[in-house]
């Protein structure tokens, strides 16, 4: 009797956990059979004849065996259904995580002092299945940290290229950290607008690690920041870093400001009505669509606005960007102003406006007829043609001395002419270079002249110090003579460069109006 009651209790528990209708029907039928069997057993009890007891015992044993077989079948079906559910859940997780490969995230890293989250890049999904802290199946992701602060976080450059000869356990650098998918957080992009004095930041040093420091000053125009690095192991604690080499850290004050801003925003939203919000959203969307349309269909000039600033110290275009200007649109808040800057024009001196208009009409109404750029280009073309004609004229001119050197003395005695030709070729070669190249070459030659003068001073000191050694004196004098010849050559080159630079300056003065 007790065994039947225990079997009935097991069937009732299985009935509570069953989700399939077919299983519930089978369990209900089995429960009814057990209840009837228990009722029959209680009714007959001790009243059953002795000759029927063996037959009744055999029936009970058969019923018990059938009950056990049905329970085992139900347990097997439940376990198989659970396994199928787990496989389906794992396949969905792998599909979800595979789609995240290549995305940025924030992943945990266990340090000696605790766990901290760092920005990382998802590079793959591990085959191993794990159970997270909540007892749920989960997969592990392989991530590479984008702002490594310790050597074990630093990605292996050979592994990224597929050429690392060591496995993950033996390599000194990281082949990717394995983290569970449930521990991944949202990526925290750097907010450079938060850069201010005493702001804690991570700075990238030549060892490819990000070191902690504090901001001393910020230049938002040049996008350069001076940082004082923490620790005593840095020889130069104060360094200048570009914005892309910094990562501003979040402080408690930032979190409080975000919370207060969220609270104020929520209160303002609660106070305003839904109709006003929809109207503002419609206006903002219409304005953005209009600005995008203007930027797409507005005339695009060949040169971008502010292209000339790379040759000057101008910051006008950068200030316009700070004030909200969108490249490709016109000036003004609505973007309907001019796109190209106003070009300066120089009218003929002493002529009336009517005469200037007649000149423009004679040029088929060319609007750029009096532009400064056009006049400068025209003057440059004229000067270039004049230089070419002068060079051809000088190269073809033959005087009496050249005739005597060529005809009477022979080609072996015309060294002076060859030097002149070489000098002209050198001057023509200098004319082909830009002003910036000439300035760099002048600085280099000046450094070589100073170095050669120092070498000559050292040789002179050696001559004075070793006046008694004849052999050494002879070698030092040969070195001194060689240094003098090289110095004379460098000084001649310096004079040629200086002459060319002076010629260009005088030409520029001639072109100024």
Swiss-Prot record:
Keyword vocabulary terms for this entry: DNA-binding, Metal-binding, Nucleus, Repressor, Transcription, Transcription regulation, Zinc, Zinc-finger
Ranges annotated as biased composition (Basic and acidic residues): 496-513
Keyword Glycoprotein: no
C3H1-type Zn finger ranges: 155-178
Statement: the UniProt record of this protein carries the keyword Hydrolase: no
Gene Ontology CC: nucleus
Role, per record: Transcription repressor.
Biased composition (Polar residues): 477-495
UniProt-annotated location(s): Nucleus
Record's compositionally biased regions (Acidic residues): 252-261, 273-283
PROSITE patterns named among the record's database cross-references: G_PATCH, ZF_C3H1
Molecular function GO terms recorded: DNA-binding transcription repressor activity, RNA polymerase II-specific; RNA polymerase II cis-regulatory region sequence-specific DNA binding; zinc ion binding
Disulphide bond pairs: none
Name the record gives this protein: Zinc finger CCCH-type with G patch domain-containing protein
